[in-house]
């Protein structure tokens, strides 16, 4: 199986460029791996797919102001996207435009210098007056995905954020949860479904394409995550009682599956903090999650491959084509699927 096997035609008009008028009013395709069935539902009815004793695991990372516009002395516009808000990488940014080592940029009266270009589309920057992350915090905007082909607007500050976002650190939202509302979470809880929160700060890999044709040649980015002891215990108790661990998105999936050896070794009694660099593609054996909520992903993306690993590629692509035929909206602001 090659990366090109995960290519498909995604018409531009199927990409959701804006969120729905009302949070939670999107559609939902339901996949049953055991029967191969594909049914159509609504995201607002997600609670009907869950069972008493299940555990819904959410990513409570909060999207930071990671997008900043700078200019060269010539006036040329350079778009910068802060990659990670960590000490060791806080001066790395994706950029759009032409840059060379030694270039000077100006952003809101602050001079930036291009110290290095470590890889294609990534610049290492220094800030003349202090911390680069502080500059982004003060003057940056919400980093909506580049494929939306528009600047962030006021509505994105609220809608490109989950209702339970808490800990700042992501440069992209955990989009599978964007349509979860307080009302829907109350219905899920009332049904006897547990809820646990983990943190994974979404970083670099969300925006970088796979450039190799072979899975083995692709190097995944690292993303910090934390699974609190309370969440670990809930996962262990759910597993022991026969309930399903339902991952709200690929970010939760990466955190839980990367942490699987430590969680299992500790008997689900210990907190786990690490950096996930796990690349999940068909052939991977899942150790923690039993069901997955996720969006419709871009062709040739690592998240599409993760979803195919969980759902089986043939069933997943059949669902994708059915979604396209039925007018579903794709990518971050689009519709979703529930895979059990």
From Swiss-Prot:
Pathway: tRNA modification; tRNA-queuosine biosynthesis. It is found in: Cytoplasm. NCBIfam families: PRK00147.1, queA. Belongs to the QueA family. GO terms for biological process: queuosine biosynthetic process; tRNA wobble guanine modification. Its EC number is 2.4.99.17. It catalyses: 7-aminomethyl-7-carbaguanosine(34) in tRNA + S-adenosyl-L-methionine = epoxyqueuosine(34) in tRNA + adenine + L-methionine + 2 H(+). It is an enzyme of class 2 (transferase). Keywords: Cytoplasm, Queuosine biosynthesis, S-adenosyl-L-methionine, Transferase. Transmembrane segments: none annotated. It comes from the Bacteria. GO terms for cellular component: cytoplasm. The keyword S-adenosyl-L-methionine applies. Monomer. Transfers and isomerizes the ribose moiety from AdoMet to the 7-aminomethyl group of 7-deazaguanine (preQ1-tRNA) to give epoxyqueuosine (oQ-tRNA). Its main location: cytoplasm. Pfam families: Queuosine_synth. This is S-adenosylmethionine:tRNA ribosyltransferase-isomerase. GO terms for molecular function: S-adenosylmethionine:tRNA ribosyltransferase-isomerase activity. The keyword S-adenosyl-L-methionine applies.
């Amino acid at each position: 199986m090659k990366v090109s096997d995960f290519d498909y035609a995604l018409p531009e008009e199927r990409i959701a460029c804006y969120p729905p008028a009302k949070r939670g009013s999107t559609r939902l395709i339901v996949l049953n791996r055991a029967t191969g069935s594909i049914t159509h539902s609504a995201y607002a009815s997600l609670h009907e797919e869950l069972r008493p004793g299940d555990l819904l695991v959410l990513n409570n990372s909060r999207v930071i102001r990671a997008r900043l516009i700078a200019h060269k002395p010539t006036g040329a516009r350079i778009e910068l996207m802060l990659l990670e808000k960590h000490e060791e990488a806080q001066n790395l940014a994706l950029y759009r435009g032409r840059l060379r080592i030694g270039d000077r940029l100006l952003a809101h009266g602050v001079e930036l210098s291009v110290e290095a270009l470590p890889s294609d589309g990534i610049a290492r920057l220094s800030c003349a007056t202090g911390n680069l992350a502080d500059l982004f915090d003060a003057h940056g905007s919400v980093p909506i995905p580049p494929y939306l082909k528009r600047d962030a607007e006021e509505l994105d500050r609220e809608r490109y954020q989950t209702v339970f976002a808490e800990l700042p650190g992501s440069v992209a939202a955990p989009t599978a949860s964007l349509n979860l509302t307080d009302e829907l979470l109350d219905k899920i809880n009332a049904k006897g479904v547990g809820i646990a929160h983990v943190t994974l700060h979404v970083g670099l890999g969300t925006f970088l394409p796979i450039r190799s044709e072979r899975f083995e040649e692709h190097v995944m980015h690292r993303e910090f995550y934390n699974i609190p002891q309370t969440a670990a215990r809930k996962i262990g108790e759910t597993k022991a009682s026969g309930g399903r661990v339902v991952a709200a998105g690929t970010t939760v999936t990466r955190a839980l599956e990367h942490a699987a050896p430590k969680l299992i070794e500790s008997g689900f009694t210990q907190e786990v903090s690490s950096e996930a660099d796990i690349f999940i593609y068909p052939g991977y054996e899942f150790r923690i999650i039993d069901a997955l909520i996720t969006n419709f992903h871009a062709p040739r993306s690592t998240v599409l491959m993760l979803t195919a690993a969980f759902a089986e590629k043939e069933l997943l692509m059949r669902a994708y084509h059915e979604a396209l035929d039925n007018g579903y909206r794709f990518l971050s602001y689009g519709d979703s699927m529930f895979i059990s």
